Design a protein with these regions (language model features):
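Terminal-appendage/accessory-domain detector
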Residues: 1-158
């Protein structure tokens, strides 16, 4: 379901062009950027048209030699400036994969971001994080399960 120039938020989730354009504009890509409206942002659409994504078998070989790295392949980004200068950045091990796991604060941030878009109240998100962080010390999972199986419907199901 990869989409070079996505039209919908769902397509945007699978578009490197969209992710790169959004990160360049906003410094990061968050869940609220995965809406139809955000993908249709005229400035983002202009940036996406300038972004070219190419398959690089050299990086794929480097990435695939590690069995546990079954997720996204290594990436190399080249940015050509108007001056002609080229900036390059390369990552063999994608952040969040086994060899470059997220720090706990990054996991917490991602969960809060996803939970807020899903319509969970901030206090419930904090309670779930707190309970999950101390999971090994819990004698009873009832409270955690109650928060995880709330009667509230996530915003995307309305």
């Amino acid at each position: 379901m990869k989409s070079k120039l996505p039209e919908t938020g769902t397509q945007g989730k699978f578009s490197k062009e969209y992710a790169f354009a959004r990160a360049l504009k906003d410094g990061q890509v968050r869940m609220h950027h995965m809406t139809d409206e955000a993908v249709q942002d005229p400035e983002i659409r202009r940036w996406m048209e300038k972004i070219k994504v190419f398959h690089n078998s050299e990086l794929e070989v480097a990435s695939n030699q590690y069995a546990e790295e079954t997720g996204p392949h290594a990436e190399r980004m080249l940015v050509r400036l108007k001056s002609g200068r080229v900036l390059t950045e390369e990552e063999i091990f994608i952040l969040g994969m086994a060899r470059r796991p997220l720090a706990f604060e990054d996991v917490r941030f991602k969960y809060k971001d996803c939970g807020s878009v899903a319509g969970l109240p901030p206090e419930d998100i904090d309670t779930i994080i707190s309970l999950a962080t101390g999971l090994e010390q819990l004698n009873d999972l009832t409270l955690l399960l109650q928060h995880l199986s709330s009667e509230r419907k996530p915003s995307w199901t309305k």
